[in-house]
């Protein structure tokens, strides 16, 4: 099935991924590529329209130039912020540094146009938007007209109606721009004429066919962690090739309570997936003995996982493919780190950490999907919603939620405390009937390797401390601590102290990010 596509050229904005998310939310497929994507590749991609992202640079910097042949393809182009300046500069207009940076909320007065018709906030012909720019367009290219302005930016929006070129000096992709989604939908659906055929049933059908074509009769191995990405990848691949898939589930002793059983029940028993369960708790605990530095713990856990997985992989002599749960943000971030051009700077282990001499071919069926799309896919494939929508869990597991040295005793105490906290979050609702688990973005318990004095019954206790952490965030870059009801915190504390022998004090973390990080290590 062929589907209409939108191409986004990324000039380095921190929020370019949000453009892609908004387009996908309109059920139109899109891809995000570096601004220097060759013109022949753009033609081969055959987009219905092109969006030029924002970016931190100046149009006068030669290192940040897209191929201007995009303006000769006869398709609509939308320039956002820097993208608008790039469009104006290369089509004969002028761009100059602004007398003052415009950052934050602004009101744009609009003039009726194909892009803005019927879209407004409050007052007629007014848009509440989010600006973030220094340079600005000072002279329009020939054939363009102003369709929006602010007091400090006379050319805040421009259009060439004949060629369907549009420029906007604000960010429609962020939630602060109230009608941003409507503007992007107008461009994608109405101006570009893209048909909204990007749906999960269509994706499953295409992905299954692609996996079958790619793999043929070969066998595939996948490291199953119990996390969302690897679980959904396993379910999708199994839907496509059945028993040709073998999953290796490494239990390092640092999983959540009953997680090992849950994974085995779900995949091996309910879905009929071949799963090799490796109990490696002793091996991991031995390697972690005496280690207190968080980064060293992470490296040890990562190295041991690879060692255990490799040992199992060598036994599966017929496996030709290694499957991974790589998702689209991983691909984008790794591309940015390699080229130094895109907006992100971290390399993801799924994409950048494979051994150079790896003999297995790589299968990444989720690499075109964002996280929320992966969750939607998981539900469509029959995975339990409760599992698919679980809060994030770190790769090293409880190893980075036990401060200092990791011991089996500590992990067992933490597992029980964490499970009680999550149970009560799920069971307690706000006035609208929404559970506090769903109201928070991430919640967990932390084991503190310090003892405090307590009194239980007629006796004195000297036991360990548990810290509770719950945050609310939209992007995990910044976060607010969740203002949980005192009654909920009190119930969690009472249950942990009474039910988990070895804990006599519970504290709640009220630090935001920044200055604190979400995880304690």
From Swiss-Prot:
GO terms for cellular component: cytosol. Residues 198-390 form the GMPS ATP-PPase domain. It holds the Pfam family NAD_synthase. GO terms for biological process: GMP biosynthetic process. Keywords: ATP-binding, Glutamine amidotransferase, GMP biosynthesis, Ligase, Nucleotide-binding, Purine biosynthesis. Its EC number is 6.3.5.2. SUPFAM superfamilies: Adenine nucleotide alpha hydrolases-like (SSF52402), Class I glutamine amidotransferase-like (SSF52317), GMP synthetase C-terminal dimerisation domain (SSF54810). It catalyses: XMP + L-glutamine + ATP + H2O = GMP + L-glutamate + AMP + diphosphate + 2 H(+). CDD domains: GATase1_GMP_Synthase, GMP_synthase_C. The active site is at 81 (nucleophile), 171, 173. InterPro entries: Class_I_gatase-like (IPR029062), GATASE (IPR017926), GMP_synth_C (IPR001674), GMP_synth_GATase (IPR004739), GMP_synthase (IPR022955), GMPS_ATP_PPase_dom (IPR025777), NAD/GMP_synthase (IPR022310), Rossmann-like_a/b/a_fold (IPR014729). Pathway: Purine metabolism; GMP biosynthesis; GMP from XMP (L-Gln route): step 1/1. ATP binds at residues 225-231. Residues 5-197 form the Glutamine amidotransferase type-1 domain. One of its GO terms (molecular function) is ATP binding. It is an enzyme of class 6 (ligase). Gene3D superfamilies: 3.30.300.10, 3.40.50.880, HUPs. It comes from the Bacteria. Homodimer. Catalyzes the synthesis of GMP from XMP. This is GMP synthase [glutamine-hydrolyzing]. The lineage of its organism: Bacteria, Pseudomonadati, Pseudomonadota, Betaproteobacteria, Neisseriales.
């Amino acid at each position: 099935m062929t589907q209409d596509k939108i191409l986004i050229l990324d000039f380095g904005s921190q929020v370019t991924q949000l453009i892609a998310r908004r387009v996908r939310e309109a059920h139109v497929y899109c891809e995000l590529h570096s601004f220097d994507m060759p013109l022949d590749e753009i033609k081969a991609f055959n987009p219905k329209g092109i969006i030029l992202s924002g970016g931190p640079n100046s149009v006068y910097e030669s290192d940040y130039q897209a191929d201007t042949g995009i303006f000769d393809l006869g398709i609509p182009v939308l320039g956002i912020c820097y993208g608008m300046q790039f469009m104006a500069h290369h089509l004969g207009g002028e761009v100059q540094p602004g007398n003052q940076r415009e950052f934050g909320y602004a009101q744009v007065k609009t003039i009726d146009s194909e892009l803005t018709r019927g879209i407004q906030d409050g007052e007629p012909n007014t848009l509440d938007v989010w600006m973030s720019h220094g340079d600005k367009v000072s002279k329009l290219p020939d054939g363009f007209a102003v369709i929006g302005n602010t007091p400090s930016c006379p050319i805040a929006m421009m259009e060439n109606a004949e060629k369907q070129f549009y420029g906007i000096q604000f960010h429609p992709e962020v939630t602060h721009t109230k009608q941003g989604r409507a503007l992007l939908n107008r461009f994608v659906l109405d101006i570009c004429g893209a048909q909204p055929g990007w749906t999960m049933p269509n994706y499953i059908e295409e992905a299954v066919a692609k996996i079958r074509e790619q793999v043929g009769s070969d066998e595939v191995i996948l490291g199953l962690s119990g996390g969302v990405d690897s679980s959904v990848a396993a379910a999708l691949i199994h839907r496509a090739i059945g028993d040709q898939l073998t999953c290796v589930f490494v239990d390092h002793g640092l999983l959540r309570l009953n997680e090992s059983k849950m994974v085995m029940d779900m995949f091996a028993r309910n879905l009929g997936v071949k799963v090799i369960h490796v109990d490696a708790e002793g091996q991991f605990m031995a390697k972690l003995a005496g280690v207190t530095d968080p980064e060293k713990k992470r490296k040890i856990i990562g190295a041991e996982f690879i060692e255990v997985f490799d040992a199992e992989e060598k036994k599966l002599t017929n496996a030709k493919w290694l499957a991974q749960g790589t998702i689209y943000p991983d691909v984008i971030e790794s591309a940015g780190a390699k080229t130094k051009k895109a907006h992100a700077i971290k390399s993801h282990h799924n994409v950048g950490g494979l051994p150079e001499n790896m003999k297995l071919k790589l299968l990444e069926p989720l690499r075109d999907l964002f996280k929320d799309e992966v969750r939607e896919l998981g539900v469509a494939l029959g995975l339990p919603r409760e599992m698919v929508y679980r809060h994030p869990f770190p790769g090293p597991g409880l190893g980075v939620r036990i401060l200092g040295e990791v011991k089996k005793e500590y992990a067992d105490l933490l597992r029980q405390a964490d499970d009680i906290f999550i149970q009560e979050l799920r069971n307690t609702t706000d006035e609208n009937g929404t559970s506090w688990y769903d109201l928070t973005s991430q919640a967990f318990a932390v084991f503190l390797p310090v003892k405090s004095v307590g009194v239980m019954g007629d006796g004195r206790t000297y036991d360990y401390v548990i810290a509770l952490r719950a945050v609310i965030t939209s992007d995990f870059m910044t976060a607010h601590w969740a203002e949980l009801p005192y009654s909920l915190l009190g119930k969690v504390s009472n249950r942990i102290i009474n039910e988990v022998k070895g804990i006599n004090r519970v504290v709640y973390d009220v630090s935001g990010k920044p200055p604190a990080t979400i995880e304690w290590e």
